[in-house]
Amino acid sequence: MDEKTPSVTNPVENEDLALLTQASRNAINRLVRCLFAERLLAPNALLWAREGRQAWFPLWPSQRMLHFTDLSLAPAGTLRNRGQIEVLDGTGARQRIDDPAALMREVASSLAITPASDGLEHLLRDVDNSMRNDMLARRERGRWSARLRQEIAEAGAPGFLAYLERSLPTHLAAMTLDQWGALEGHPFYPTWKAKPGLAAEEVAALSPEFGARVPLRIAALRSSWAYVEKMPHVGSYSEWFAENFPDLSRDWAEGLKARGQSPEDWLPLPVHAWHLEHFVRREFAAEIEAGIFDPDGPEIVTLPSMSFRTMLPTTEAPRPFIKLPVAIWMTSEQRTLQAKSIHMGPRLSTLISDIVSEEDDLRCRLEILTEELGAILRHPETGDEHLGRFLSVVYRKADALARRDGLLPVTVAALLTAGPVDGRPLICELIGKSGDESEAAIAAFFRLYARTVVRPTLAMYLLYGIAFEAHQQNSTILFDDRGLPRKLLIRDFGDGRSFAPLFTERGYELQPFSRGGILPTTFDDDISLVRSFLINACFVCHLHEIALCLTEQYSVAGDSLWRVLREETEEAFETLRPRMLSDAFWLEERQAFLERPWPARSVLRMHLERYRDYRIEHQLPNPLASAE
């Protein structure tokens, strides 16, 4: 680690100590939420004080007791720790728990599962790395916020969002907000910032929450060694690339000619700069030597989006996003770009585009960032694409971010991120435009927000069997000049799930991707895997988090916002009922969304079990069932 970067375990300055304390609390709070939500610790074993928010949890194997000084229960069984945690032994002695490692070791013997032999230590290493990176990010966020406050004041803008709208093209304003919203990561991932293997200066140089600018190399891949997937309107790969990146295409072709090569024999293949120097040159040395892959070429500067490896060129005129593999472990997964994403991104983009073009109501409520083109290294004789997960690309059109209708695109995670002016979540700046922050106004705003998300999402699922992964990173809301939500903009279809009988019944087709060792995403027999994907992403990770935020920020009474969400979900079901395949199907799905427990991904358990199963889920109390 860089000597200038303080160690998490040995902070040397007051600022570092404050940042460490904040990072440690962040980690502990995420772990507490996951431990109880995933039933690794039984929430019904908590002993609550008659008044206030104190609670105790018995650790029977060790004959000890956890004491929470400020623990609150929100809808969906969400336990939020806002105070100190102590452990009491049999003598009554107390010891405060100040770091996540101490918490996990204290509860390890009481977990409802048996972790893998190295599961706990791997988890703690990733949590520690998350804390290090969280400290770096929040230190830089303080500096970035100070700069922005000065710029906003000098511009006389009423807020951060207004300042961005005035000072940048809409697509770059949207990307600034996307990077701004990358600070917190997934709302409850316990390894929310883990990037093991990256030095501190690399984390800062490559990560969106630092406002990074990252170069991409436009390398070359032998066309005979490439598989290309494209939407029907796209011509050849090279023609599309030349049309969308004319200067790069020209420089790339001239470079090949200067090296004695014919550009017609090659495809331009963007490669992330870090990935090229730290992985590709070493792991693909044989392909480079054999003339299959040429690592030389021109470069383009890009803005990494919230996903870290989907990049938007910094050009004044919008260019397509470039999604790439990066051989870095982040939030406990290596960020490859598998063949499934190359094949299914353009295919699902085509299917969804065809559906939306025929559905007037959907067209008014929904836009998508289409994945027009993808390519991957593929062995010309065996057809093997496995190695290509490290040499691949998907291009995603960015035109929907370049607005001319006055709407501002804001990635959902940015709405929940503290703004630079007053430190409140940015969603509060949008609500504040009305000048009315009464409870009735908050409920009205959330009703419109929920309708904006729920109507198109449920229509696409219930009528066509297509589930958007509409969590905070993939969902963008288009807001009007009054700060009101108007449309949903969805991205990332490579892993989208679908239920074939529904869209085929309505005359549509989708070629599924099937490959050994890769989880399928198109299903024929069981819609529950598609439904759980949608509920977890859209309802648990997105709408529930918005309701939690607004309830806390505006002291909204009880579960009234979940009651609003229930009403909007009920209304969506009633509207769609005449078009659904059967009343039995309508009733089954209505009960799944409104009455039965919600499925959610067990991210902490997966980590502890070393990812032996990527589809482990747990059940959350359905907050809509109790909000009648």
Curated annotation (Swiss-Prot):
GO MF annotation, one: acid-amino acid ligase activity
Claim: Glycoprotein is one of the keywords in the record: no
Pfam families associated with the record: FhuF, IucA_IucC
Superkingdom, natural source: Bacteria
Paired cysteines (S-S): none
A single GO BP: siderophore biosynthetic process
Keywords annotated in UniProt: Plasmid
Family: Belongs to the IucA/IucC family.
Protein name: Uncharacterized protein y4xN
Organism in which the protein naturally occurs: Sinorhizobium fredii (strain NBRC 101917 / NGR234)
